[in-house]
Amino acid sequence: MAVERKFVADGVRKVRVERHLGHELKRAGYGGMDLIRTPLGTQVTIFAEKPGIVIGKGGKVVRTLTQDLATTYGVESPQIEVQQVDNPNLNAQIMAERLASALERGWYFRKAGSSTLRRIMDSGALGCEVVISGKLTGARGRVQKFTEGYIKHSGDPVNTLVDKGYAVAIKKLGVIGVQVRLIPPGAQLPDHFEVTAAVTKKQRNMAHITRIPSEYDEEDLDLDAIVNEPDDFMEEE
């Protein structure tokens, strides 16, 4: 198989695994997964709000998932690890699933979208964008965006800093797509910088003083006089 075809096949396999886990672990608060190849096989890390449901009684569920990944999706020697999501409000996939569930239960899309945005920002996110698209109020499709804070749309930070989630709400008029994008707190943005105060000559000279000569009496010592001495005095000492 050519290298290009191999990359495409790996990408398609990852998307299929993502969809399968999202469908099977919906009750567990599925929050995404990482798939990493190792010399011993494939490490699959599942993030969930309720890890106990992912593992199952006696590990039954996780064994079934391992078998499905190996046989149905061709994942080489899958080793599943389950991690609990510390703050579900800062997980884009979990919030997208919650928003889709609220729309299916009959919530008005503006109320559901703004409530989701407010909950994410109140949890400390640097920025968030919620996009709801589909037949929201009538027969014609439309797109509604809710944005607050700082969010990146291009460049490498989109892949490294922005957490993305997607879900679908099924209603009588048709399906509604939900996208949630957020930047978690503490993210180091490339265009962020801090301006520090200028260092005066007196402060710079104070930083060079490491000891007080023994011939000086501490009570009569004039630090300002020592600090303001020329540089050649410091070198002679």
Swiss-Prot record:
Family: Belongs to the universal ribosomal protein uS3 family.
The keyword Transcription regulation appears for this protein: no
Classification lineage: Archaea, Methanobacteriati, Methanobacteriota, Stenosarchaea group, Methanomicrobia
Record-given protein name: Small ribosomal subunit protein uS3
CDD domains: KH-II_30S_S3_arch
Record's keyword annotation contains Flavoprotein: no
UniProt record, GO biological process: translation
Start and end residues of each KH type-2 domain: 17-86
Keyword annotations: Ribonucleoprotein, Ribosomal protein, RNA-binding, rRNA-binding
PROSITE patterns: KH_TYPE_2
Stored Pfam families: KH_2 (PF07650), Ribosomal_S3_C (PF00189)
GO cellular component: a single term: cytosolic small ribosomal subunit
Superkingdom in the source lineage: Archaea
Subunit structure, as described in the record: Part of the 30S ribosomal subunit.
Family annotation (Gene3D superfamilies): 3.30.300.20, Ribosomal protein S3, C-terminal domain
